[in-house]
């Protein structure tokens, strides 16, 4: 009897595209499973008119989906790794981390003007504190204007509203089939450190589902898994959500060691903590990077930013 695996997904075009891609790959690994997609609307999808940092950070796009997993209404879910909270509900696991897409941020501007050449006070659209803080480190004169909506909506707003440029994740553009020529320039990690897990997917399931976990083990990419787990350990130790400008990105160096860079900044980009740590164990590398930065005052900064946001929200 062929097992039908119910897959939970957000409704957005990007989420559905990612989910269908994962299903296709899993069918190639083992054709003896059937798959059925169940669309789930999350809190983050329902709130469209405020910045994410004001409505409670991480987990906004996954909570309802995780509830459906716990209730056994679905068997697995495909998420963007950067939407995943650092700690999962009991009984659930990230069963699989496929190969990572491009982790960089992409700048798309009117008339293809590069960041360094933009006029003083140019208006940049982003709804990410991490991106805006790092843009302001490089160009303190820029005006940051919040922007929400899917890729198509944002590209349209760039054309019709008073934005000089917008910043999007390169991975999302690529998965949605946008050609690289829409991008004015890719921001290298040295200039704009990516969000933890940016460009990677997380496939979540119940810890007890051995059949699915066995299937997933054939689809996990070891390089991505090691590097992303270090980033997530850093995020967890820093207790950072969407509410603070926090970034973490890892690569494997020539010696096959994890090289992890973490960043915490004030929203205006005036205070920056940045450290790079090398080691073999993802959990240890992430924690050590966080501890180094906490010693220098990064943790105090996070607490202060959270307090200020709470007061703003009242």
From Swiss-Prot:
Domain of life: Bacteria
Alphabetically ordered keywords of this record: Porphyrin biosynthesis, Transferase
UniProt-listed InterPro entries: HemC, Porphobilin_deaminase_cofac_BS, Porphobilin_deaminase_N, Porphobilinogen_deaminase_C, Porphobilinogen_deaminase_C_sf
Catalytic activity: 4 porphobilinogen + H2O = hydroxymethylbilane + 4 NH4(+)
Cystine connections: none
CDD domains noted in UniProt: PBP2_EcHMBS_like
Modified residues (S-(dipyrrolylmethanemethyl)cysteine): 242
Note describing how the cofactor binds: Binds 1 dipyrromethane group covalently.
Cofactor: dipyrromethane
Entry's Gene Ontology BP terms: heme biosynthetic process; protoporphyrinogen IX biosynthetic process
GO cellular component, one term: cytoplasm
Record EC number: 2.5.1.61
Functional pathway: Porphyrin-containing compound metabolism; protoporphyrin-IX biosynthesis; coproporphyrinogen-III from 5-aminolevulinate: step 2/4
Gene Ontology molecular function terms on file: hydroxymethylbilane synthase activity
SUBUNIT field: Monomer.
Its job: Tetrapolymerization of the monopyrrole PBG into the hydroxymethylbilane pre-uroporphyrinogen in several discrete steps.
HAMAP family: Porphobil_deam (MF_00260)
Note, other: The porphobilinogen subunits are added to the dipyrromethane group.
Similarity comment: Belongs to the HMBS family.
Protein name: Porphobilinogen deaminase
Organism encoding this protein: Bacillus subtilis (strain 168)
